Amino acid sequence: MNRLTILVLFIFFLNQCSFSEKSRLWKDKEKESAVNYNIKEIFSEEKKITTELNQELKLDLSKIISSNEILKNKNNYGSQDYSGLINKIGNYKFSKFDNINQLNYKPLFLDDGLIFFDNKGSIIRYDSNQKVLWKTNHYSKSEKKLKPKLNLIISGENLLIADNIAKYYSVNINTGKLNWLKSNSYPFNSEIKTNKKYFFAVDYKNTLRCYNVNDGSECWSLQTEKSFMIPNSKYSLIIIEDMVIFSNSIGDITAVDIESGLINWQLPTQRSNILQERYNFKNSKLVSDGKAIFFSNNEQEFYSVDVKTGTINWINEISSNLTPIIIGNLVFTVSDDGYLHVLEKNTGNIIRITDLFINYKIKKRKKIKPIGIAIGGTKLYLTNTDGKMIIVDLSHGNVINVEKVAGNFTSKPFIFNQNLFVIRNGSIVQYN
């Protein structure tokens, strides 16, 4: 009887402790398995290999209308008026930046010149002959040593500035005289957008701030989820009707009512636990045609999102942090590995892929990354980290020329008044 009792108890023990999924032994195993799974998901992602598609497809771009009009509040540059001779005709000089690894700042282009800044945060206005009209600096001696980087925008007769040392201010565009100056709690890390009475910028705390154009007083602020990682790219903003829409460091896209500062909708695009490990996450700028928002990132995601609701229209697998360009029913972008993608705007279908790095040897192309694109007429201009600019015939997709424009780092190309500009460290070069 005792033997039978012991046997029954032994079997019962095994059932409850060894084979039951609810037992501690099983839980520990399951927990260990889950940990291993998470590690694999974060660190062992598969990299998509890009190949060319429909190389023989010719695009009908005969109805493209090029212009100098830029829908600045939508970041929608389209095809601009530029003949593409690539003859150097001007050089706007400034003191070089220290320890720079990217030139992701934009000059302000005027009909009679341009405005930019130098290594100490001095704002410089040039005329069309590269002559300095005025130069002004509104930083203390200690602040100049921090090498402030400025984001600039024009509002009427005034220039609005937000920088990476937490200052924002306004100067007269004709004289450089200071109108007002204020400080924020955190440095800014975004472009600036403005409407008639407000301007907007996002700081490193992922907080969108709305300021009064006339005196710099804060109208409202909206903080989104913070990240422990320092972002590798600037945040982006667009304004559509009564909404300001922006991205932050963790990939959230948020639409906010301009007057109240209340959220209309928010779209998370990344899982936060993955982002904590992927410190090099980069989003492209947001671009809109008024109905949809287009953007991509370096995690093989290209999005189209409905402006009104924030719902996803489509997602395609393209890894790129370059600002896409919309022309008619087509969207153009270049992937991190140098492939030009042409997509249908409404469906997201890729209709052609062309290798723009085809003339580089395999070892060389692994070290090169695209910086930015511009489209002039039916030609695409792509700058790269090796200081070269690749010129592409968009109709056929073939490379027609390669120009050396800098020793190494350069900016994306900018087109204005039938001229092309690129920023090198120490100068802005103008081509006709």
What feature does the model see in each segment?
Residues 326-327, 333-343, 349, 353-392:
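Loop/turn-rich, solvent-exposed surfaces of beta-rich toroidal or solenoidal domains
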Residues 63-66, 88-108, 132-156, 177-196, ...:
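Extracytoplasmic beta-rich repeat domains
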Residues 124, 169, 209, 254, ...:
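WD40 beta-propeller blade core
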Residues 127-131, 172-176, 212-216, 258-261, ...:
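Short loop/turn segments that connect beta-strands within beta-propeller blades
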Residues 49-120:
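Beta-strand-rich domains and repeat architectures in extracellular enzymes and scaffolds
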Residues 11-46:
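Bacterial Sec signal peptide processing site at the extreme N-terminus
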Residues 120, 129, 165, 205, ...:
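Surface-exposed loop/turn positions within WD40 beta-propeller blades
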